[in-house]
């Protein structure tokens, strides 16, 4: 069976973009078992409470939930197991260096298939304070209101 081309998003972490300001993003592969890949292809995954952490010079993804494959047998995987992230050595060293700075962490933003390979987009993030979240919400509401007004003006409806 040939691999499909393009990018098919399986799961995205919307809460990460709300709780953190993303400074930089990277694309990483994941070391997965066969049943994990099949479960991902079925569109079943959750990135809630997931994070990446350094151990022995490698990066590992903790807390990502991939449910057991429905048609799997005794070879099924553990849903919340730690998964190794596959990156170049230079990228790993750069990420480890950034996380050693105060207040920075690595969070997964989305899981997707790129040309048939399971990938995770990870971001170097800094936690937002509650007032930052309120400011972002106010900005988003203002942008939405501007777009709504522009849409009315384009349709010939005046306020």
Curated annotation (Swiss-Prot):
PROSITE patterns: SSRP. It is found in: Cytoplasm. GO terms for molecular function: RNA binding. Its main location: cytoplasm. One of its GO terms (biological process) is trans-translation. One of its GO terms (cellular component) is cytosol. Pfam families: SmpB. Keywords: Cytoplasm, RNA-binding. This is SsrA-binding protein. It comes from Salinispora tropica (strain ATCC BAA-916 / DSM 44818 / JCM 13857 / NBRC 105044 / CNB-440). The gene is smpB.
């Amino acid at each position: 069976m040939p691999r499909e081309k393009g990018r098919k998003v399986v799961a995205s972490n919307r809460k990460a973009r709300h709780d953190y300001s993303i400074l930089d993003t990277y694309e990483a592969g994941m070391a997965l078992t066969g049943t994990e890949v099949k479960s991902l292809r079925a569109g079943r995954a959750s990135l809630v409470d997931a994070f990446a952490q350094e151990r022995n010079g490698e990066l590992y993804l903790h807390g990502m939930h991939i449910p057991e494959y429905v048609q799997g047998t005794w070879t099924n995987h553990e849903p919340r197991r730690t998964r190794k992230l596959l990156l170049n050595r230079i990228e790993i060293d750069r990420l480890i260096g950034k996380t050693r700075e105060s207040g920075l962490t690595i969070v997964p933003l989305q899981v997707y298939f790129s040309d048939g390979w399971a990938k995770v987009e990870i971001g170097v993030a800094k936690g937002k304070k509650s007032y930052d979240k309120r400011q972002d919400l106010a900005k988003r509401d203002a942008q939405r209101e501007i777009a709504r007004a522009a849409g009315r003006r384009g349709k010939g409806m005046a306020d």
